[in-house]
Amino acid sequence: MSVNGPIDASLLRIVRDRTGAPETAICRAYESDASFRAACADVRICFRAQRRWEAADSSRAPALAAEYAELLEDLAEELRRILKPEP
């Protein structure tokens, strides 16, 4: 285990579901790569915000939930790039 510690189960599930990457690859990257950890932190924040807007009773809620969904996909793509660097 590194000084940063392992990824928690809820974040692991979110990242796995968004990237399709194996849990072992996600755990390794989380423990060894600061940019991956930072992107994971952004994913967690974005995921929570999207869920809040999906549950919100506001005329703006659907548009904001959609914006967060799009941002979440962009972040997932960033995580996939980190997990599978170009040859």
Language model feature labels by segment:
Residues M1-P87:
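Extended, charge-rich alpha-helical interface modules
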